[in-house]
């Protein structure tokens, strides 16, 4: 079936699909009794192109040493050649008889074969190119596997000489491949992994060198050096394996992160079923080689089965994993036997039977389909990955009392209170801990009470609505508390990420003559480990419980936190090596790991800063500074100079963090007034920190000196005011800040009357009594709010359309369900003066119509082709508007996010047109259409085409949903003089009913 994971394949298939779609329409018109036009010229052009393609294909086969390519490409070439002959025969027959039914059948079969054969041909060649890259990757892996046995400098020199050319070749190939891929996520993974390999390779070689030196010179630290080397080699191995995995991917699921269990399982089952035929064909062919398409199909079925097992019920998961284990071991043995030339048919037959038992056939129900059915019966949904997402799920449950969400809303509430319980140990406001715990208990109680009422069919009475209102308020209160706790923790733990490392470095490089040198090293190593652990744990809390909903940011936080945890012991071991070995190699080795650790920690802090609200962070920083101000006052009162120094140092660190945040905000914006305002506030803050520190030093020298203490208080208050001004500059609240309620009002004695003052012959007497105070104005009620803009005809048509396609009917139809999900996202916005929302709503309706057409529920093949083309046109409109909005957005990160999510849409829409053309060539060739559009008694090809079409439609709807969300966020930060007008009017809830 067509695949589109490279730009080259997509560029070749699109014009072919356009020609095939014309032939499909001609075929359908002929079925209505019309004569088919003379096709001699277009068919002749196709034949010449096919002849040239076949010649190039066979030349490639003969010149290649890839035996898998030599086995896979000829069948595709033969199909293209046979399909071309069918077109030629149809052309000749139609010229003799324009109404010939046999000729029309040959025409459609030839068109279908040309498209699918060309796709198979391109995929076969592309897989051969991927295997070339993977061979280089495996060569690097082979060298990494022997890194542990290199024990001499000569061996190391040879190792570097051998591995360097392969690393260069792999890097060059990955850079070229990345530019070819159409899936953005795959491109990013390849680049990230390759960059990591480039960074780690010199560090690993240096680690190998220091290990050899320590071993040869019998110095201390041999075990630490070996662990450093093994860690780096393993990390490089993991990155290379990830590169190999991504290189072999041809599809990407855009919304798997947000999908419920049933949706993910259904997609995985569909993918596994589409691979079964290829796997069984390879098992039946005794000449099938390891690494061929069929063997890879088995491996992918195993991967999809693991994905299903991870979401299935426990008993189903155990059965799936046991079957997968059997299939994996049998496949490994089969590959080994075939490579040795032994008799493998018995083993292949057994493996085929196990595969059928796992995936299912028309005769066998299958373990995976049964697991999906059982999960559907129990609900199969899972809460979102973040607290913010879970809050949305819970509110959706409460806002739709008549809709059965299979317990998802209740699960989301329980997950929120469970995460809140994890925050309890770090809840700093001890006097409020009891209140925090009671709030969680009350939320659980009310959620259970509401679920019980709905279970008994009492979800709509006033009592249930009262519980909903209370539960909504309590959930929002809980989320606010969690957000504050996490922000406070971020402020505290990330205030200074450099000092623990700097102190550890000083301990590592301490002179051997210093007393208690090793004791100091152990202390600083423990401090570094504790600091890293706190940073990583806090970051993981931000990822799970923080306000960020961005998948990319959350995953980046988790990855960086895990790297910090893994690298910390390696840095300590490298420091221990340097402590006992004062050599250039030991210095270089330690510096390499220290810099890598520092980079990862800074990257983690950057991701955490992106995940929390800037204004909340600055307010929390100011509050923390005030708390440490209290500690300083206690130090002054108790005559504790060291405490004064420590606490003022922490205040200065908080101030510097706010300063760094302000600079980041200014760098992230292109709005001149905002940048000017923030930079001015940052300059005032920058100038306020040194005076506070200097005055604190004077207090530390003489805590009893009242003048010094007052000078410090004034400087500290000035610093706190500067921090507050930075927050006001970022939020834009400075101009509207209410006057201070703590002003000191002095009583001024009345003055004696003075002589008149003349101003341009007007006499003003200061002793003239003031006129009486006028009566208060009569209270006038404010004018009524203007009514919302009237619903347009488009809005009425949209509502009427979706009333005919309710959510309950969409649950068993994946394409309609994807369209419905987009509609649910868009129904909150009015399309009045918002072209992005209007175009996205059209896309949702068109996708629902496409679902009807591919299921054979009315319409013609021409309707299917035209519907796909209309979806592609609307996709271009959404992309154009999103790009236009992004260009006017003044916040760089928002702009990049919007551009990244909308750039996927045209590619997916083009793929949809091609897949719809493939489906159009198959419509009418089956007697019955199943619940997911699959043929009950049709070809395996049609089923595979349907699965790809479903996945493509789901990806397109998810990308449009992401684009609308990013556009709404970016709309509040557009240039005021841009002339761009996008109104985001949130529709009242009653308008959706």
From Swiss-Prot:
It is a peripheral membrane protein. It is found in: Cytoplasm, Cytoskeleton; Cell junction, Adherens junction; Cell membrane; Cell junction. Its main location: cytoplasm. It comes from the Eukaryota. Transmembrane segments: none annotated. Residues 769-790 have a biased composition (Pro residues). GO terms for molecular function: actin filament binding. One of its GO terms (cellular component) is adherens junction. Residues 730-797 are annotated as: Disordered. Residues 758-768 have a biased composition (Basic and acidic residues). Keywords: Actin-binding, Cell adhesion, Cell junction, Cell membrane, Cytoplasm, Cytoskeleton, Membrane, Repeat. InterPro entries: Alpha-catenin/vinculin-like_sf (IPR036723), Vinculin (IPR017997), Vinculin/catenin (IPR006077). Involved in cell adhesion. May be involved in the attachment of the actin-based microfilaments to the plasma membrane. Belongs to the vinculin/alpha-catenin family. This is Vinculin. It comes from Brugia malayi.
